[in-house]
């Protein structure tokens, strides 16, 4: 089986790799390995939407960090796993650099955050309300807002399907690929 690899080449290349994987008949499924401290919300959501809309089975495995935009990437797969020591940090959308301090800017950030919470709640078992509660928690992170969940907590909250490692992720992917092959006739 072929693997599609994308090693930090940029979001455009990752989207192109996903499109090629979707079209390539020799690829039966997708294993997504995640370790991210966040990043570009627009690019991350675009990649998450592509993963969620693929016809081929996809399994994600969070190995290290799954911060803000890493959450939609993880839940976009048909099934998600997380190793026990990995973390998922849920916090409000942030920006850096200069921006205009007016109500419209705030509303734009709020809309972007709503897109993230809507996507995550639609592709996992957590409610949008609970996700926002975790996102706006002021008690956990020093001088910050949000929540850090370890692997078992992420499963308990309904963000991720199961605690497991690479062997279990591959086992689940093979199970989904066999199921998909059985329905194609």
Where are these regions (language model features)?
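Single conserved hydrophobic/aromatic residue that forms the stacking wall/gate
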Residues: 2-13
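Glycine-rich beta-to-alpha active-site loop
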Residues: 36-47, 51-97
